[in-house]
């Protein structure tokens, strides 16, 4: 179940990351423009992937997704399983509008084309809080 405090990391403000693995165990990691909250047990990723990522997901549907809370800096690590691709409907339409909004703000209108909303079932989720500056400061003698 996705906790409420994780939702800000799934609103498309910051790019996420997707780690996949081929059938032979070769890993691959890419940035994804959107990690989108669908419901308490599902997220959607924008399908704009390179062929290697799409092939990996077809061979092995288990992935790791990382997304980031833009206010707190917390990282959320999701273990998930690919369920389906949607090319129409409410989730696809909302993601397409978000992608266009980001493109217009960055001066890249018309550059990005959402090909699909890939729906993933979230199997586990872990919050990794951002370390405070005091925790990052080297120890002095």
Residue spans for each PLM region:
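A short, structural micro-pattern
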Residues: 12, 59, 74-76, 111-114
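A short mixed-secondary-structure module that forms the rim of ligand-binding clefts
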Residues: 33-72
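C-terminal edge-of-domain segments
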Residues: 79-141
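Buried hydrophobic positions in well-ordered alpha/beta secondary-structure cores of metabolic enzymes
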Residues: 25, 56-57, 120
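Short acidic, glycine-rich loop/turn motifs
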Residues: 20-24, 67-72, 124
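Short, basic/aromatic recognition patches
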Residues: 1-15
